[in-house]
């Protein structure tokens, strides 16, 4: 772990100096090393290299590049730029479906987040994770899961 610490710190410092396509792998690497606060900060970073820039430029879908003018022939509706979706669902909300049909909840919602709510429909069930008043709740089809979080 001590050998990888400088690499993780370097990645956190550099942020999204990579293209949009590699952003998923950067977010995933940070999450798998327990750096959920960094993942959250990168998701909401306000630089020219982030999804906030796409919103600033009027995006209603994800761009191929971080901004319209950053690539001469950029697509303004590109699937690889949707990296936040699985990262938010799996790493922040912690919704993990098993191949057998079960679900484990392992949320990693940063302390700085006062309110969080996500609900997603998969496998004919609705999975919900909410953080409010400092407490995290998970539910399947509206039934609270008893696991302490």
Map each language-model feature to its residues:
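Long, well-ordered core segments of solenoidal/helical folds
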Residues: 2-17, 34-54
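Solvent-exposed loop and edge beta-strand segments that line ligand/cofactor-binding
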Residues: 7-24, 70-80
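Well-ordered alpha-helical segments within folded domains of soluble proteins
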Residues: 19-31, 81-90
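Alpha-helix C-terminal capping/termination sites
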Residues: 1, 29-32, 123
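Non-catalytic C-terminal accessory modules of carbohydrate-active enzymes
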Residues: 40-149
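Short, structured coil/loop segments at alpha-helix boundaries
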Residues: 1-4, 19, 136, 141
